[in-house]
Amino acid sequence: RESKFLKGLRCTDKDTMEVVIQVLCGSVNKGLTAEIESLGSRAIGLSGADGGMIKAVRYSDDKELGFAGKVSSIQSDVIELALNNGYIPVISSVGYDIHGQAYNINADMVAGHIGAAVNSERVIFMTDVDGVFLDKDLPESLISELSVKKAEEMIDSGVIAGGMIPKVKSCMEALELGIKSAVIINGKKPEQLMAAALGEYAGTRFFEE
């Protein structure tokens, strides 16, 4: 069945939610964990249910979105325990409300909240393009630095659209949560990830005026 998106968010009915849990918390999570281990690092696969890590609520009253959710809080104990023992936590973006109902949450939104919960200085969002463009068909129109105010204007005007909206909003939210640096880079280019991790210029960096 073809996925339906609304404002960049996946519409998630009951049946789709079951598939999301099986795939994100199962095959994808364990596949990434195994791949990291194969490269010589220690990793542990986790989901929002573990230790009550990701508390969620319904994203909106829009019935089309169904079980699409948003983060209400992060319990970081399990994450910090993993990090303090030398493990890279691989976390699926499924959260649960106080009644145990699962919600499909945009992974970028979860990443920003987790970054803030563990006091990260920098959060890096990866996609399949080099960052935010004034014109997606013109590579030279890449915006290297973007203020929160300007980003909001670009969303309102439709320059930033589709799946880029939640990524940009996640960057904005990360800054609001106290993270010093939020960047969108091309995850297919290792050199961009290395540069962003070192605090060098890559992709689109967001800042508050």
Residue ranges and their predicted role:
Residues 1-192, 208-209:
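Nucleotide/pyrophosphate-binding catalytic subdomain
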